[in-house]
Amino acid sequence: MPQRLTRTMLALGATAALTLTGCSAAGPAETLENGDEKDVTIAVFNGWDEGIAASELWKAVLEEQGYDVELEYADPAPVYQGLSDDDYDVTLDTWLPITHADYIEQYGDDLVDLGAWNEDAKLTIAVNEDAPVDTLEELAANADAFDNRLVGIEPGSGLNRVTSDEVIPTYGLDDMDYLTSSTPAMLAELTAATGAGENIAVTLWRPHWAYDAFPLKDLEDPQGALGDAEGIHSFGGKSFEETHPTLAGWLKDFQMDSDLLYSLENAMFNENDSDDYGPVVEQWIDENREWVDSLTS
């Protein structure tokens, strides 16, 4: 766990000064036999592990097919701006109809929705399993048991928007200190609190490997402030279907259930002590070869 958190924080630091780069170099782009441009840039949201896992998986799969793949990390706003400008080719972690709806409303005319590859996504407020509350209503009445703290993630995330605009006012959590910084910082606090047997409340989401790593429970949301289950969509830039017609078709057909996703996330983030995800993903691919081969068949 410490290695995972350190790795992620280093990655975030390295990408904080990211400058968007165009996908097209000078001169004609190199093309594969299947009609796709050889170069692919996948934009990945900072801190969202299901997107990191899916992106690393597709990077490995596409490199087997002869593509040159770059993963570029950024927060959602620059990702969608970059997609709309064709600075990125595709991103694999758009949650709809709630979490990233504002971005799609702003940039959607210049994007291509390639469909949902997982339909089980859910925003949550999670607490340690033995916490003295079971609902968000009870959290408001027992905030002192959590030192009046609710630990969030990146300020620019859709989860932060839903928490600030919907959850906090709906359940009267305004007197709690709502702390936003980053997903790694939230996970570090979660690690420390559960290790010390202390109460903690965090913003989280399913699917996420933390549910296997920590003794957690989701607080019930009787008012539906966090919304219903969402789909995790792939979105391409406005030229993506022209520059990568074969890959666009593969992504439209892409489906990954939560059990498979948990398996990949656990291998990458829970069981992995390496700074390099590549070998871990390659091993996971070998263990799931029949399914992986179906992605490009």
How does the language model describe each region?
Residues 122-132, 230-245:
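A bilobed periplasmic-binding-protein/Venus flytrap-type ligand-binding module shared by bacterial periplasmic
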Residues 35-50, 67-72, 147-151, 251:
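Short, well-ordered beta-strand elements
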Residues 20-33:
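Bacterial lipoprotein signal-peptidase II cleavage site
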Residues 1-21:
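Sec-dependent bacterial lipoprotein signal peptides
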Residues 109-156:
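A conserved helix-loop-strand patch within extracytoplasmic ligand-binding domains
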Residues 88-92, 162-224:
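Ligand-binding pocket segment of bilobal, Venus flytrap-like solute-binding proteins
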Residues 46-49, 71-82, 177-189:
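Short helix-initiation/N-cap motifs at beta->coil->alpha
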Residues 58-65, 145-176:
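Ligand-binding cleft/hinge of the Venus flytrap
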